[in-house]
Amino acid sequence: EMCIRDSGGIVSGIAAAAKLKNPRVKIIGVEPEGAASALAALKADHPVPLDEVATIADGTAVRQIGETTLEYIKQYVDEIITVSDYELMEAFLLLVEKHKLVAENSGILPLAGLKKLECRGKKVVAIVSGGNIDVLTISSMINKGLVLRGRIFTFSVNLPDKPGQLVAVSQMLADADANVIKLDHNQFKNLDRFHEVELQVTVETNGEEHIQHIID
């Protein structure tokens, strides 16, 4: 069983109830790398304030875990693991794309943590909870996740400053089955190259192999 780790209350409560029902169940808490206050407290054997908190999982962006919840964690939680913001974005995209569900960033910590465990042949429950997320954040998470997966790719190329170049590039991208999202044709960026312009292109792709095909 896997639980999120906020200020410690959720994982403490679930762990205590689960262990009461079945003492053999293993409880694993998951927290963001940029706010690993539970791990810091366990290493010091008492709550300690983090020097910095930086994570997209704002619901678990806790500088210091509570004393009471730390005692529950030490008693009932078998392990605490951490995940990166990159892994959180991957998990968010998986949840939306494959399972048609939306949860807040902190709520998908257990899903992101699954990749760090050997789950084959075991009964594992990843508790996904919390829907405190707005539409703009959802859009940002999806787009950034697509960029990380190579599904959205941006590149720049210098072109001769003469008519027909945009048509040639557009045709090349069409031949490579790349769907254009944005073209930025800037005549004034490379002032040291008077007869050239910079073209920045953003396209939809099918992944890394498709990107390599476009580059080649």
Model-predicted regions and their roles:
Residues 2-4:
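Short, small-residue-biased leader/transition segments that mark boundaries at the very start
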Residues 11-22:
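Short Gly/Thr/Asp-enriched flexible loops that form oxyanion-binding sites at enzyme active sites
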Residues 21-34:
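Short, acidic/small-residue loops that bind anionic groups at enzyme active sites
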Residues 46-61:
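N-terminal glycine-rich dinucleotide-binding loop that anchors FAD/FMN and/or NAD(P) in oxidoreductases
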Residues 66-122:
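Active-site-adjacent helical/loop segments in soluble small-molecule enzymes
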Residues 115-143:
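Catalytic phosphate/nucleotide-handling subdomain of diverse soluble enzymes
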Residues 137-216:
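A conserved regulatory-domain signal marking ACT and ACT-like small-molecule sensing domains
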